[in-house]
Swiss-Prot record:
PANTHER family the UniProt entry points to: TRYPTOPHAN SYNTHASE, TRYPTOPHAN SYNTHASE-RELATED
A GO biological-process term: L-tryptophan biosynthetic process
UniProt protein name: Tryptophan synthase beta chain 2
Catalytic reaction annotation: (1S,2R)-1-C-(indol-3-yl)glycerol 3-phosphate + L-serine = D-glyceraldehyde 3-phosphate + L-tryptophan + H2O
Origin superkingdom: Bacteria
């Protein structure tokens, strides 16, 4: 079989929280003013109470509200595919599977948390949300989600992506989102960069600063983000929970699990339910290889330093313990805009530091070569971010070709690339550089 489908009734009813399964406690966020663990009231200035509770929860399973499940059912469960054409093309004995998150209305995994965050903000009496977006995947997911709960949504979009991907902006505006190129002249955080250079390419760190500044300055507004924090990764575990069931249906357990990493949410969403088996002490699963893939232009895990740093460029967030290239690092304007982040989710960083996760970084051109191979064998044009996972899956499959091992490889196709065709155009005409 090529495709493994679950019924609507099999959408997971609970999210998996990996926090209580960690072999040692996660270092808490610190208040930069006191260097003490941040007090909940500081977080409540920008997040609603239910999400702050989820951020620090020690419960392994957290119920998914009915209202969230109802919207999930528009596209979930998502299919698991066996990439047989790709296997044949590579001539590998490996079996390659991918979880297809591109089938959501916004075209990526991002609505899994966007819908949940919009719901919790709505029941907390919030009227407006601000956020940042790189390639526009997160901004479009939050615009999509907020319309169901009658919330206003303002998106600060990294300027290089705003210019590269006009159709993402149109998508956000179709779903009632207001899109502002960042850095902008509308916030103190943005103005500093904007006045130096009105065409500043921007970064996720700067856009986060702008969105947080606005949320903190208005009573009716909270901040929402698409990656990095524990509650965001929690909501994404629906991906891996479904994939576990589907892999059982296919009759396999993966030897290798792969995901692209920018902030860590799609990677964690697929891998954490499998890593939970390892953390619970299942000896049969301890050889599981979990591989995080990042761009060489922003090699956070592979070249970053494990330390406390700000989550944004200006220093408005608490300090979080993560692998970081420095909060003022501005990556080159690669097309995988969703991977241009100086840090990574603390949970992903902790598991990497403890040796449960491996990491690899690739050049942009080799990633697009893998993307085109995938499009020409499996038919789906992947998002540049997802193509990083495809490149790693191909490399793992080619290793199996050399060794003769019949490994089972599972990767996350986190989104489609139909709004990224200008990048493909450049690649196909030899104009894409590293």
């Amino acid at each position: 079989m090529r495709k493994f489908l679950l019924s609507e009734g099999e959408i997971p009813k609970k999210w998996l929280n990996i926090l209580p399964l960690l072999p040692e406690p996660l270092e808490p966020p610190l208040d930069p003013e006191t260097m003490e663990p941040v007090k909940p009231e500081k977080l409540l200035a920008i997040f609603p109470e239910p999400l702050v509770e989820q951020e620090v929860s020690d419960k392994e399973w957290i119920d998914i509200p009915e209202e969230v499940l109802d919207i999930y059912s528009l596209w979930r469960p998502t299919p698991l595919h066996r990439a047989k054409n790709l296997e044949e093309f590579l001539g590998t004995p490996a079996k390659i599977f991918y979880k297809n998150e591109s089938v959501s209305p916004p075209g990526s995994h991002k609505p899994n948390t966007a819908v949940a965050q919009a719901y919790y903000n709505k029941i907390s009496g919030v009227k407006r949300l601000t956020t940042e977006t790189g390639a526009g995947q997160w901004g479009s997911a939050l615009s999509f989600a907020t319309q169901f709960f009658d919330l206003q949504c303002r998106v600060y979009m990294v300027r290089v992506s705003y210019n590269q991907k006009p159709y993402r902006r149109i998508l956000m505006e179709t779903w009632k989102g207001e899109v502002i190129p960042s850095p902008s002249p509308y916030t103190n955080a943005g103005r500093k960069y904007y006045e130096e250079n009105p065409e500043h390419p921007g970064s996720l760190g700067i856009a986060i600063s702008e969105a947080i500044e606005e949320a903190a300055s208005r009573e009716d507004t909270k901040y929402s983000l698409g990656s990095v924090l524990n509650h965001v990764l929690l909501h994404q575990t629906v991906i891996g929970l479904e994939a576990k069931k589907q892999m059982e249906e296919a009759g396999y357990y993966p030897d290798v699990i792969i995901g692209a990493v920018g902030g860590g949410s799609n990677f964690a969403g697929l891998s954490f339910p499998f890593l939970a088996d390892v953390l619970r002490g299942d000896k049969r699963k301890e050889d599981l290889k979990v591989l995080a893939v990042e761009p060489e232009a922003c090699p956070t895990l592979t070249k970053g330093e494990y330390k406390y740093d700000f989550g944004d460029s200006v220093g408005l967030t608490p300090l979080i313990k993560m692998y970081t290239l420095g909060h003022d690092f501005v990556p080159s304007p690669i097309h995988a805009g969703g991977l241009r982040y100086h840090g990574d989710a603390p949970l992903v960083c902790k598991l990497y530091n403890l040796g449960y996760i491996d990491a690899v970084a690739y050049k942009q051109t080799e990633v697009f070569e893998a993307a085109v191979t995938f499009a020409r064998t499996e038919g789906i044009v992947p998002a540049p971010e997802s193509a990083h996972a495809i490149k790693a899956a191909i490399d793992e499959a080619l290793k199996c070709k050399e060794t003769g091992e019949e490994k089972v490889i599972l990767f996350n196709l986190s989104g489609h690339g139909y709004f990224d065709l200008s990048a493909y155009d450049k690649y196909l005409h030899g104009e894409l550089t590293d």
